[in-house]
Amino acid sequence: MLDIHSHLIFGVDDGSSCLDESIRMIEIAEMHNISTIIATPHFHNGIFNNNGVLEKFELLVNKAVDYHVEIRLGNEVFADDEILNIIKAKKNINFGNSQYLLIELPYSDSFEHIANLIYKIAAANIKIIIAHPERNRKVMKSFHEFIKLIHTANCQVQLDAGSIIGVYGAFVKETARQLLKIKAADFMASNAHCARDYMTLYPAAVQKIYQLCDEEYAIKLLESNARKIITVEGSISEYGREIG
């Protein structure tokens, strides 16, 4: 399996607090058959930036050589009006050198403003992956409009493991499952902030995915869609949610 959203890098955001915790996260991820983790520290201008991230990422990779888990670098970028300037400045916020960008939607903005932001980002030739939209009540209260938005702007959707098993409450769980039911989600990721998340939340969510989804779709959510992103083999081109 591949995990495209994890706060694995220590001491840069609200994720792993130290190198030992990061190594423990990798160890447990390997136990649960995760072969690749994309480390996605928060990038939120004025709150979290990527200063020092590369150095800690390289240290972590060097310390984790005994584990059979590939570690790649990305970011979880907060989508506000400043994001367009960040993209224009060509700061290293994407998944490696790809055009894919994992974005977190603002929780207090109107759906109309969020949709406008997404269209502007897409117009900058960015392939958008929306992180855990099921947790954003303002967005999910405009559920049908959101589905039209991801179709029109050609966005991909990443669900959190915790959402699927009810960590964030009944509304979020049911919304996540509705997205799964209509196959509007493209990835399920850990959004792990500590070793415990890999030990408990992620395996429980994987089990639930296989209960809720047919095997082909489950594999896409957990592995094959993510693999096509990191190998730049394809992208979602239509609402059918197929990659390639």
Regions found by a protein language model. Give the residues of each.
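Extended substrate/RNA-proximal surfaces in nucleic-acid metabolism proteins
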Residues: N49-Q158, I236-G244
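Mid-to-C-terminal alpha-helical segments outside catalytic/metal-binding sites
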Residues: Y202, V206-G244
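Active-site neighborhood of phospho(di)ester-bond hydrolases with catalytic His/Asp-centered motifs
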Residues: L2-I4, I37-T40, R72-E76, I129-A131, ...
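A structural motif
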Residues: I34, N154, A184-A185
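Non-catalytic positions within long, well-ordered alpha-helices that form the structural scaffold/packing
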Residues: E30, A122, L180-K181
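Short acidic/histidine-rich active-site segments
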Residues: A184-T200
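An N-terminally biased module of ancient metal coordination in phosphate/nucleic-acid-related enzymes
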Residues: M1-H68
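Active-site environment of divalent metal-dependent phosphoester hydrolases
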Residues: H44-I47, F78-D81, R135-V139, I164-V167, ...
